[in-house]
């Protein structure tokens, strides 16, 4: 995902065993590559790689402040992200942004994003505002989650800059592998933090069974195990899409229109436009084509 300010922009048996092991290894390598690709897609454009705080003590202190007197059960917190926010309202002093991914045992297809704006002094963090209304899709289930603050200056108006929370999830089973990336944008104004837009940024699915059938079919045609082209079979059984976020110079109700389009040549000229309705972008969510 990227952001810009533009309008358009041995024997047969032992051989078979080795071949089977090689295939399993390729599948594992491919799945790991899928996870890595998702993470790289999420971080490629972001300043958060260096700004996100990874120190557990600081994360837990910020999480405790965010939770306040109504905390979520500890086993429901599936991820925490914390970062300084240099582009927040200057009148508020040095700011920090924090997010927690919360999923209770009764929830399976989505999870809550608890997000807050903090200040910090010699006594620790202090909560200025928080929101618990945003949810992210975790279907088919939350498996390997990734959470980070995105503090690129998302300038939604001439005077106001939003910040983002990046969520990633990779689910792997014996049959398939699914990866999802979602960006949620927030504004902090008048003592309140509010989600203003959410977009699917990265999505992929890999059909392992289909790839295995493809390799077996190719082996049969060639009459010699190992002559198949696994990369080709992997590609044929992988579906993925990535979206690019940008802002148009055109404004609606004093805020820049937001554009989302598929990444790459396939997305040239195709974009979905979102306009400001006074409080958020409308429609509020982009879930893909």
PLM region spans:
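Solvent-exposed N-terminal domain segments of exported/luminal and surface proteins
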Residues: 52-109
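Bacterial N-terminal signal peptides that target proteins for export
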Residues: 23-36
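Acidic/hydrophobic-patterned starts of short beta strands in beta-sheet-rich repeat architectures
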Residues: 91-101, 156-169, 252-259
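N-terminal signal peptide c-region/cleavage motif recognized by signal peptidases
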Residues: 44-46
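Short N-terminal edge-element motif at the start of the domain
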Residues: 95-156
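Acidic, small-residue rich beta-repeat scaffolds with periodic aromatic anchors
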Residues: 49-75, 173-289
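Short, conserved, GDST-rich strand-edge loop motifs in beta-rich repeat architectures
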Residues: 102-107, 168-178
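Structural signature of eukaryotic scaffold interfaces centered on beta-propeller domains
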Residues: 83-92, 146-158, 244-253
